[in-house]
Amino acid sequence: DTWEKEGKIVPLRGFCSSQNEEIPKQYDEVKMYSAWNVAQSNPCFEIWLYYHFYENKPVDEEMQTFVSFKEYVSSTISGGFDFQRDPVRLEDAIVNTRNNFSQDADGKPTLYSSEVYVLGEEIDKFVKNDLAKLRNKLG
């Protein structure tokens, strides 16, 4: 739980927090370019993985027994997310993530929301046929 920074050992959470302070500024700068898209997730990227399997937002009471959302996702997806097998669930993830998406007054994703479904929609255009073949193969 420590990280080397400028020759000093600091708590990892503190290091990550200090690195993340610039994210809102960088987000606003990137959004100025119409050819670029930024996809944020709250609380983390794993909410996108979660929506590959689940239609509804996580239940807060279940979350309280876990240290992190990543740990929660690992425990709720039997065997964890399999990057070889589970991409066939892309269309489910897009629908589930879109249906559960909401923003706050500043336009930032609220808890258990992700904008990654927008990227998923773009990827799906290119892999739709391959995913259909893989789904048929997996039965």
Spell out what each predicted region is:
Residues 2-139:
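C-terminal accessory helical subdomains adjacent to catalytic cores in phosphodiester-
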